[in-house]
Amino acid sequence: MGRLLVLLVRFYQLFISPVLPPSCRHSPTCSQYAIEALQKHGAIKGSWLAFRRVLRCNPWHPGGYDPVP
């Protein structure tokens, strides 16, 4: 299940993200964070961490360096 989710994020990175303007306020980007979280913590916890990260990626959050715990 985790590998399938990583493939979906990679698809987004390769085919969808290049046509959108850059908007991630964090380093690593939210999609790269999602891949790292899925690989490190598995499908359930990794998805939860990625979901929380995407919610933090907004104009009211300062952003910056935010590695996977």
Curated annotation (Swiss-Prot):
The keyword Cell membrane applies. Its main location: membrane. The keyword Iron-sulfur does not apply. It is found in: Cell inner membrane. GO terms for cellular component: plasma membrane. It is a peripheral membrane protein. Keywords: Cell inner membrane, Cell membrane, Membrane. Signal peptide: none annotated. Belongs to the UPF0161 family. Could be involved in insertion of integral membrane proteins into the membrane. This is Putative membrane protein insertion efficiency factor. It comes from Magnetococcus marinus (strain ATCC BAA-1437 / JCM 17883 / MC-1).
